[in-house]
Design a protein with these regions (language model features):
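RNA-binding basic/glycine-rich loop and surface signature characteristic of RAMP-family CRISPR effectors
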Residues: 1-385
Length: 385
């Protein structure tokens, strides 16, 4: 068994800044041929519920960490898995029977699969050689990425104010302090002075904040595309039956008799997509309770993501290209953690140290697999190495 202490864990908060290099698509709902962006309701600076664009934490967690990170780990170790294990690793599994609480299984998973320890899963019955289904709790919370804008300003100011425009910070501070003073003693009615201070703060600072902090709708753009009917293209009609194939061209359909021309409904249509414009910034908070090896796996996965850093849908059109910057908090310690961008990755000392630990773990892992003719892991995963 690998000599790896799964109980030596630290709590780390990563503050993630996402800079869009091309427009971003993240669809919340589709109405006809119109794709609408995903939004949630937030309480804005005026205390009113307002819609705001978010890139869901689930999309970040699964799109970057679960799919890319798990695939990279299996590639590194040369492992294959059976379909049930594949679903458990890449799709989060399922609960399909009575649940158990096998602590030895939980320990084994965290020793042999740090990526699954980080992400968690719902282990179906029979998977990993254990009869009962079981929840494996993850060690990371990935928050949704909020567009930095007027609607999200109260939340981002509390979490990571450095992402907000410099000219907005004084007004946000005064408003935040005045609002907190209203509820300093929740057992009694706020004082008349506190109420007046809050009213004055809104009157004095809200107009300027609306100028320096743009509404999320000002980052919105509409991309209309025409999906053409290929059967109406004169250059492509020749590939249809009866379309006069060129010399030497054989029909894949065999001989066909000419048919009378019939009216066919055109497949041509105009599609309309909502996108968040290039240059916008999003903020996501990640909370980790991880070992050094698990943190190193996260760093390694982010470096893999940097090889093709696209978020959201419609990447085939170049949408979703981005760069990411992470800052960390660990107790009273805080600082820069990691930058990822195509060809321009930068690792801080803590990030590099964690990544080195993960690479050393992989080296030991390969030795563990080579020494075991009938590896415990191979039976565990139900596949062959």
């Amino acid at each position: 068994m690998l000599n790896y202490d799964i109980y030596d864990r630290q709590r780390i908060t990563l503050h993630c800044s996402i800079k869009l290099k091309s427009p971003l698509s993240h669809i919340g709902e589709v109405s006809g041929n119109v794709s609408n962006l995903k939004t949630i309701k937030l309480i804005d600076l005026e205390g009113q519920p307002r819609s705001c664009f978010v890139y869901s934490g689930n999309a970040l967690r699964n799109g970057i960490l679960r799919r890319r990170g798990t695939a990279a780990a299996l590639d590194n170790l040369g492992l294959e898995v059976n379909p049930d294990v594949h679903h458990t690793l890449f799709a989060g599994g399922r609960i399909d029977g009575s649940t158990g609480s096998d602590m030895d299984l939980d320990k084994k998973i965290r020793q042999l699969m740090p990526w699954l320890s980080v992400l968690g899963t719902a282990k179906p019955a029979g998977v990993f050689g254990v009869k009962d289904a079981q929840m494996v709790h993850g060690r990371i919370n990935v928050g949704s990425a909020y567009l930095v804008c007027y609607e999200s300003a109260p939340y981002i100011y509390e979490q990571f104010p450095g992402l907000l425009p410099v000219e907005s910070l004084e007004g946000l501070r005064v408003l935040s302090d005045a609002k907190q003073a209203l509820s300093s003693d929740p057992f009694s009615h706020p004082s008349s002075d506190a109420i007046l201070d809050y009213a004055n703060a809104k009157a004095n600072y809200l107009p300027g904040l609306k100028q320096s902090l743009k509404s999320w709708t000002q980052y919105l753009l509409v991309d209309q595309t025409t999906r053409r009917d290929s059967t109406h293209d004169p250059e492509l009609k020749r590939f249809l039956p009866g379309g006069k194939p060129t010399e030497g061209q054989l029909s894949l359909l065999g001989e066909t008799k000419p048919k009378k021309d019939t009216e066919k409904k055109s497949d041509q249509m105009i599609a309309s997509d909502r996108l968040i414009m290039s240059g916008a910034t999003l903020y996501s908070r990640w909370d980790l309770h991880t070992t050094q090896v698990e943190t190193g796996w996260i760093v390694d996965t982010l470096l893999r993501f940097a090889e093709s850093p696209y978020l959201g849908g419609k990447g085939n059109r170049g949408n979703g290209l981005c760069s990411m910057e992470f800052w960390f908090q660990r107790g009273d310690e805080r600082g820069h953690f990691l930058n990822i961008s195509t060809g321009q990755n930068q690792l801080s000392e803590p990030a590099q140290k964690a990544h080195n630990s993960y690479q050393e773990y992989l080296t030991a892992y390969r030795g563990f697999l080579e020494e075991a003719s009938a590896s415990e892991l191979k039976g565990f995963l139900g596949g062959a190495g």
